[in-house]
């Protein structure tokens, strides 16, 4: 089942300064779709478009189920100066109309998973970048939506944090959630994503599973990195 269907003819922050062109893809239940490309390729802009945050867009973003909820986990942590970690979680639970019992159970489980339980009464603005990234992951996964939109989740995560994140990804996919994740970490993406959307200069140069990407790049045994470089060379 499609959780979101994206059809962007063009998009940008100004109508006269378009960034995206001819972007079409879907995210299905149980999928982890990797939005792959270098810095400045348009990955974050595509995510903003999916969420309706781009000032100009010609096209359509369709959520077939009107009741589909999504969680957005940004690349840069967004935190309140005067709220403790626990208060951040309480606030998110209140916005999501989560019962107190469910909130406490999920929050404590995630805090322990990411080894932040002892820090729950501290201010996250004083945390390291990696710890702040874990806070954003906890906030997103605590809500258990049908769709996760995740922007560069690996930046700042230590190996334990990355393992914990990947464990959660497997769990929510098994529960039927879909994930749209942008990253330029091709080695990790190759290992975990079910399909890929390769972006260059605001347009799709290839998409599909790894086998399809290999066929399109004419590298039958190539890594995702090698395939991406080959496809870029074909564009030039």
Question: What is the predicted role of each segment?
Answer:
Residues 51:
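Helix-to-loop junction immediately C-terminal to a conserved catalytic motif
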Residues 36-38:
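The feature captures the beta-strand-to-loop junction immediately N-terminal to the Walker
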Residues 1-6, 10-22:
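A short, flexible loop at the N-terminus of ABC-type nucleotide-binding domains that lies
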Residues 90, 94, 101-119:
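Conserved ABC ATPase "signature" region
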Residues 148-152:
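Catalytic Walker B motif of ABC-type/P-loop ATPase nucleotide-binding domains
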Residues 123-130:
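Conserved ABC ATPase signature
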């Amino acid at each position: 089942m499609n959780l979101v269907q994206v059809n962007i003819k063009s998009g940008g922050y100004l109508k006269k300064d378009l960034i995206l062109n001819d972007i079409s893809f879907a995210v299905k239940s149980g999928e982890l779709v990797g939005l792959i490309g270098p810095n400045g390729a348009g990955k974050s802009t595509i995510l903003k478009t999916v969420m309706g945050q781009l000032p100009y867009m010609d096209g359509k973003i369709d959520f077939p189920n009107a009741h589909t909820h999504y969680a957005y986990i940004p690349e840069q942590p967004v935190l309140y100066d005067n709220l403790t970690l626990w208060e951040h979680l309480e606030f998110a639970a209140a916005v999501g109309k989560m019962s107190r019992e469910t909130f406490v159970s999920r929050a404590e489980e995630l805090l322990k998973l990411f080894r932040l339980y002892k820090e729950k009464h501290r201010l996250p603005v004083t945390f390291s970048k990696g710890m702040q990234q874990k806070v954003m992951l906890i906030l997103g996964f605590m809500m258990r939506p049908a769709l996760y939109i995740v922007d560069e989740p690996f930046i700042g995560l230590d190996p334990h944090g990355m393992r914990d994140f990947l464990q959660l990804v497997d769990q929510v996919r098994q529960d039927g959630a879909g994930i749209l994740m942008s990253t330029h970490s091709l080695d990790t993406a190759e290992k975990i994503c079910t399909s890929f959307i390769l972006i260059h200069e605001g347009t799709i140069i290839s998409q599909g599973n790894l086998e399809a990407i290999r066929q399109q790049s004419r590298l039958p045994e190539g890594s995702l990195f090698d395939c991406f470089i080959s496809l870029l060379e074909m564009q030039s």
